[in-house]
């Protein structure tokens, strides 16, 4: 109805549009979004064992092409506003809400008889439909690659592929019927029911703390000790310091401990080159990581994580050594 109402319809997006939200936007004639770095755009239904059942498997391929749209739907990728615009999903970016509404009104005034591309006479798929030689080359190997990856246990990507391919060979309205049949096949399957239960209901319950012991206050780690500055220890140190936790990274020698801390520095340097990390942020994070070979520096840690080499005697040794300096209410964990 939006597409064929005879009036220009613009989707003004001031935040995230995933799943049905983006499908509604795709049914509009134009999409303008606020360039909010936290906003995400995509069709992630495959993560729940489903396919985009609101026209997503028909509109997105007709908008950006079969080859470009399949990875977004079959992998459930979520894009930033800038990447969504680069992919052709978003038509324009706005600096704020006022700019977004201004652009939306201007586009409506400039396009009083807007129609969706696929409703225009002579419409052709960007990059070709499923019969185009370039697309055929991809589709010829896609099923076998998909089967190798899913082992036949994950039907959603297969149904997405089938819906897109079959839908490209018929008119748009018939394509919606094709999509509806493949969606119905998934929504009643045990696979999707299990995935929805696990990744929606159970995960939301976990995030709300339903599995936490009752009658205990929430604990907070302010100082974390890590035994072993190898790959695992260095990685734990980085993510912990990034979360604002003071970290003591201990190894058998100062050189080894410094090498573990250097891992965090390397990641931050890469972030600076990409413009995602400032120098002050880098220094602040590195300042939270104390590399040491002295067990005394672990004193006062709320949590100590053992991440040393998989050797029973070594693990026993570092555990015994650490017990002497552990906080009375501290927790000792093994990675």
Predicted regions and their residues:
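An acidic, glycine-rich surface segment that forms the CoA-thioester-binding/catalytic face
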Residues: 1-14, 56-59, 195-219, 283
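Glycine-rich beta-to-alpha active-site loop
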Residues: 2-48, 52, 228-236
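Structural motif
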Residues: 12-13, 44, 227, 235, ...
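Amphipathic alpha-helical segments at domain termini/boundaries
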Residues: 23-29, 67-182, 199-201, 205, ...
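Hydrophobic, secondary-structure "cap" segments at the distal end of domains
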Residues: 57-67
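Rossmann-like NAD(P)-binding element
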Residues: 139, 255-259, 270-334
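Long amphipathic alpha-helix in the N-terminal Rossmann-like dinucleotide-binding domain
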Residues: 182-195
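NAD(P)+-binding Rossmann beta1-loop-alpha1 motif at the extreme N-terminus of oxidoreductases
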Residues: 207-270, 290
